[in-house]
């Protein structure tokens, strides 16, 4: 994404009523104008202003780097609490942060469909720029391509993030040990229900908004108190249940959860009951699961609750020895049930 091309455009982009056409992806004057007047204008920073096809930056000597990439195809593009733009920033920042890393830079790639309104694209790009600024993680390079009408769905966005892990931090999905505590940063299911309600034009007494948010500051606050956190994961597609099954399998352990301890907003619980969904399998975009030694659980929970994104944090269970790697849950009625892997796709195109 070159930031300094000046081609003497005859007229500015018609943002109000203009649309993407094939020329915007052809690499010529129209493409350069789109990049300059829409993308660079929103993402403006020292790397983009260099006008190169890549971003060059220094990294701390001896640093352990983390890289993550995430493709976003959410439908609808705009939903209560966010849009594909802010979601694409938050999602990749969170993937980097779940290694305990400080996110430093983002790259963004756009697949645009011919005929997509420039006004909607501008809204998405400005939302991305705002999310990146708020997180303090600049978008330093990128790319755009255009596909023919009918061969895309408006816009798809892929973001890639780079970060650095502080010395002494070792977080890994294989790190859970029997006796460890399982902590959750907040309520489950808002993002998935917000997407579904918008997609299906469902109305509830209280609007359900996506929880989409960047979690790296919360992670930094947690690690400042308990640097020995063993596992971090954000329960996105497949929800909490799928995430915990992944960790159990990676670590070779089992888990026992307490259903009464898992927070779900009443309106989300009601919506899930109406729609035949289980909140434990519904996607989140601004929550995390942490696993730590039981002796550190109280201190870590206090650190989480001291951050705006962790005020509703709870201790929800424990890690146990189990060669089957089952995730089980004590129900509110006193029984036990297996919380299995998600079978199939519960909510398609959720992120």
From Swiss-Prot:
Post-translational modifications: Modified by HypF, which adds a carboxamido group to the thiolate of the C-terminal cysteine, yielding a protein-S-carboxamide. The carboxamido group is then dehydrated by HypE itself to yield a protein-thiocyanate.
Molecular function terms, GO-annotated: lyase activity
UniProt pathway: Protein modification; [NiFe] hydrogenase maturation
CDD domains per record: HypE
Gene3D superfamilies noted in UniProt: PurM-like C-terminal domain, PurM-like, N-terminal domain
Top-level taxon in the UniProt lineage: Bacteria
Keyword Lyase annotated: yes
One Gene Ontology term from the biological process aspect of the record: protein maturation
The EC number(s) this enzyme carries: 4.2.1.-
Class of enzymatic activity (EC top level): lyase
Protein name (Swiss-Prot/TrEMBL): Carbamoyl dehydratase HypE
